[in-house]
A protein has these predicted regions:
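Short glycine-rich loop/turn motifs that provide flexible caps or phosphate-binding loops at active sites
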Residues: 9-15, 115, 147, 208, ...
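Predominant activation on well-ordered alpha-helical scaffold segments within soluble catalytic domains
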Residues: 20, 123-130, 184-188, 231, ...
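C-terminal helical cap and adjacent loop that interface with cofactors, partners, or active-site loops
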Residues: 239, 261-316
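C-terminal substrate-binding/catalytic lobe of Rossmann-fold NAD(P)-dependent oxidoreductases
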Residues: 12-46, 137-140, 144-145, 149-283
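A glycine-rich, Thr/Ser-enriched phosphate-binding loop motif common to dinucleotide/cofactor-binding enzymes
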Residues: 113-124, 175-184, 290-299
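A generic structural signal for alpha-helix starts
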Residues: 10, 120, 222-225, 289
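N-terminal Rossmann-like NAD(P) cofactor-binding subdomain of oxidoreductases
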Residues: 1-175, 275-277
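Active-site catalytic microenvironments for nucleophilic, acid-base chemistry
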Residues: 128-132, 217, 304-308
Length: 316
C-alpha cells in the first residue's frame, strides 16, 4: 500500500512542528513540503493540497478560513487546529471520546476541527457528567486551568526562555480576565450548556503540561451523588478509550500523590481524576497542552480519518 500523503500548512509553528515530529518517522506517511517563499501563497498551498490525503492547518483563524475556501472541493481531508470552525455544524469535532457519532463524523466528514487545549480539559470533565444526568446544563461551572508557557506559541516561549527574564514570569499569571476566552464557545456548544463557565486560565513557568480542574457543589447537581458515583460515571464514559484514562479514587495528599500539571508532558494521553468529598468535589484532567491538547489530538483524528488505529504514532 502506498503511503498516505500529508501536507502541514503552518509547519513552522508550535503545533505544526509537533505534528511534523510525530509523522516524520512513520513509514505509512509521506509529508508534502512547500518552500519558504510560497508558504503564504494561497494558490500554491491549494495546488499541493489537491494531491494530499490529509491537510493539517496550523494557522490563525483568518488564514485558516482563507485556505479552506481556496482548497474548496478537493478530496483531501482537512484538520484545522484554529478556533475558526469548532462550533460549525458541518465540521466534525475532533474529540472522538465523546461517542461513536463523533468518531463517525471524523471518519466520514471532509472537515475536522481540532479542539482547543483548555477546551479539551473542560469538555473531558463536563460532558460525561451532563450525559449521565449528574450535572444540569445550567450548572454554574467555575473552572481553573494551569498550563505551561508553550501554549502561548513562539512569542510567549521566547519571553519565558529569554535571558534575563522578566521578574513577573517566575510566578503563575492568570489571563483571560474578561471571561471572553476563545475556547468557551466550543465548551458551551459541545456540552450543550446554557451558560458559559467562569473560566480562570493560568500560565506558569514550565514548558508544557496542563491541569484543568472543574469544581462541583453536590447540592447544585441534578441528583444526589457521591464521589464514588461521579467517578463511576467517568469510568463508564471512558471505558473503551485507549487515550483517556480515569485514575483510581482515594488520592492522598502527600508528596507522591500531588496532582502535577506537567505529569503527562511529552505524551498524548489524558488522565481524569476525582478528588474531594460528598459535599464538594473536583474533577481534574491532566494532559499535555501540546499533546492531547493540540498535535497529539490532531494526529489521533488523522488516524481515525484514515481508518488506522487511533493511537498509531502517539506517545501514551
Amino acid at each position: 500500500m502506498n503511503p498516505y500523503k500529508v501536507f502541514i500548512v503552518g509547519h513552522e509553528g508550535t503545533t505544526g512542528l509537533r505534528i511534523h515530529e510525530r509523522l516524520s518517522g512513520r513509514k505509512d506517511i509521506t509529508l508534502l513540503s512547500i518552500s519558504d517563499e510560497d508558504r503564504k501563497n494561497i494558490d500554491v498551498i491549494a495546488s499541493i493540497a489537491k494531491d494530499a490525503d490529509i491537510v493539517f492547518l496550523c494557522l490563525p483563524d483568518a488564514a485558516s478560513k482563507e485556505v479552506v475556501a481556496a482548497i474548496g472541493d478537493y478530496p483531501c481531508k482537512i484538520i484545522d487546529t484554529s478556533t475558526a470552525f469548532r462550533t460549525a455544524d458541518d465540521w466534525a469535532y475532533g474529540f472522538p471520546e465523546l461517542g461513536e457519532s463523533y468518531k463517525n463524523d471524523i471518519k466520514t466528514k471532509q472537515h475536522i476541527a481540532n479542539p482547543g487545549c483548555h477546551a479539551s480539559g473542560m469538555i473531558s470533565c463536563i460532558a460525561p457528567l451532563v450525559k449521565a444526568g449528574i450535572a444540569p446544563v445550567d450548572y454554574p461551572f467555575t473552572i481553573t486551568s494551569l498550563t505551561g508557557y508553550s501554549g502561548g506559541g513562539k512569542k510567549m516561549i521566547g519571553q519565558y526562555e529569554s535571558e534575563p527574564k522578566d521578574y513577573f514570569l517566575y510566578a503563575p499569571r492568570q489571563y483571560g480576565l474578561s471571561q471572553q476566552h476563545k475556547h468557551l464557545p466550543e465548551v458551551t456548544h459541545v456540552c450543550g450548556l446554557t451558560e458559559a463557565p467562569i473560566f480562570m486560565p493560568i500560565v506558569d513557568d514550565y514548558y508544557s503540561g496542563m491541569e484543568v480542574s472543574v469544581g462541583l457543589h453536590t447540592r447544585l447537581l441534578a441528583k444526589p451523588v457521591t464521589v464514588e458515583d461521579v467517578h463511576a460515571a467517568l469510568v463508564d464514559f471512558y471505558k473503551d478509550s485507549t487515550i483517556v484514562k480515569v485514575a483510581p479514587l482515594n488520592l492522598e495528599e502527600d508528596n507522591k500523590q500531588l496532582l502535577n500539571a506537567n505529569k503527562l508532558s511529552n505524551t498524548d494521553g489524558m488522565v481524569i481524576s476525582v478528588t474531594g468529598n460528598n459535599d464538594r468535589m473536583v474533577v481534574h484532567a491532566i494532559f499535555d497542552n501540546l499533546g492531547k491538547g493540540a498535535s497529539g489530538a490532531a494526529v489521533q483524528c488523522m488516524n481515525i480519518a484514515l481508518g488506522l488505529p487511533e493511537e498509531t504514532g502517539l506517545s501514551l
